């Protein structure tokens, strides 16, 4: 598949439908609880599948993947922070909050990438699922540390700064007990320890309806992403450019790690690139809102959900797969 055919995947088309419905002011809406239920199902399904595959995988390779997931989660926010400061469009607090989103991961983008790979018949390793489960928290920690550093510099310079909400221990607990992280890790453990026969009995639930539920999830995400269009004027052109270019740079770093450091196949390398390129819009926003009250939520929400998520779904995933094919397919 190439060119326009890369976009002719039901999941991507449903995202476009949701986006269009919002633009033309349709009354199409999802009940909040239904949207949450779709997210829960997808996390459980991908966790069980990943755990089942992990049970057959090599432990050393899994630990290696875990290590590089932490490295990505720690380094990408720092890169994003200094790039944002260089734009001179945001202060240190907003730079820290935005950077935390870009060091974390988007389960929705990851699931869309899986749908894309399945649609073109590309196999992938189970290890990126482990990486997905652990990359949320390191980025949140780095975001908090960058904000604390900025706050300390402001106080040292005699400037007044708002007191960050919540202590570090509380925020770290929030990060590690976040519902999406607990669900994903818990489902992975279940998929790992359950007997193959018992996993087979729930395959209609975790496999057969997966793609259909993903289409509904992305329909709702299209509606939500289009809602952020109105905030673009507040974000500014340079920050919109950051929301497009940062994922591309991070995705290339992900390709280098997926193939060069982990030795993954084209599919696995693509998924590592997607993990590196995605920006969180579920776990990180509440953590930043609580811990970095100085930051403007409309900036990091508009960038992660209104710019980067649509870019990755429509253009980024095919791009990262193309690069992975050129690198890992040699």
Describe each model-derived feature in a short phrase.
Residues 1-55, 319:
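N-terminal signal-anchor module of multipass membrane proteins
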Residues 25-27, 45, 51, 99, ...:
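Generic secondary-structure boundary/loop-capping signal
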């Amino acid at each position: 598949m190439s060119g326009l055919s890369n976009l002719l995947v039901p999941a991507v088309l449903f995202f476009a439908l949701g986006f269009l419905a919002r633009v033309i002011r349709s009354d199409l809406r999802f009940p909040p609880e239904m949207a949450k239920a779709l997210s829960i199902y997808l996390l459980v399904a991908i966790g069980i599948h990943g755990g089942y595959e992990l049970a057959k995988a090599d432990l050393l390779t899994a630990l290696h993947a875990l290590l590089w997931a932490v490295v990505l989660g720690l380094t990408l926010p720092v890169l994003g922070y200094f790039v944002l400061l260089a734009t001179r469009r945001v202060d240190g607090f907003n730079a820290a909050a935005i950077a935390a989103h870009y060091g974390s991961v988007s389960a929705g983008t990851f699931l869309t990438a899986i749908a894309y790979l399945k649609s073109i018949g590309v196999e992938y390793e189970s290890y990126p699922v482990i990486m997905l489960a652990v990359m949320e928290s390191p980025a949140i920690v780095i975001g908090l540390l960058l904000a604390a550093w900025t706050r300390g510099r402001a106080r040292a310079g005699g400037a007044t700064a708002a007191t960050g909400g919540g202590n570090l221990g509380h925020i770290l607990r929030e990060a590690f007990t976040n519902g999406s992280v607990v669900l994903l890790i818990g489902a992975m453990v279940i998929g790992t320890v359950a007997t193959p026969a018992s996993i087979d009995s729930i395959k209609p639930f975790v496999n057969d309806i997966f793609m259909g539920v993903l289409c509904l999830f992305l329909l709702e995400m299209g509606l939500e992403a289009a809602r952020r269009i109105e905030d673009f004027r507040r974000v500014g052109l340079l920050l919109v450019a950051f929301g497009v270019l940062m994922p591309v740079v991070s995705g290339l770093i992900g390709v280098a790690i997926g193939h060069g450091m982990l030795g993954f196949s084209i599919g696995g390398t693509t998924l590592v690139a997607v993990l590196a390129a995605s920006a969180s819009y579920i776990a990180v926003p509440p953590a930043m809102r609580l811990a970095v009250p100085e930051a403007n939520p409309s900036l990091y929400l508009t960038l992660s959900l209104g710019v980067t998520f649509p870019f990755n779904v429509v253009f980024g995933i095919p791009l990262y797969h193309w690069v992975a094919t050129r690198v890992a397919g040699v």
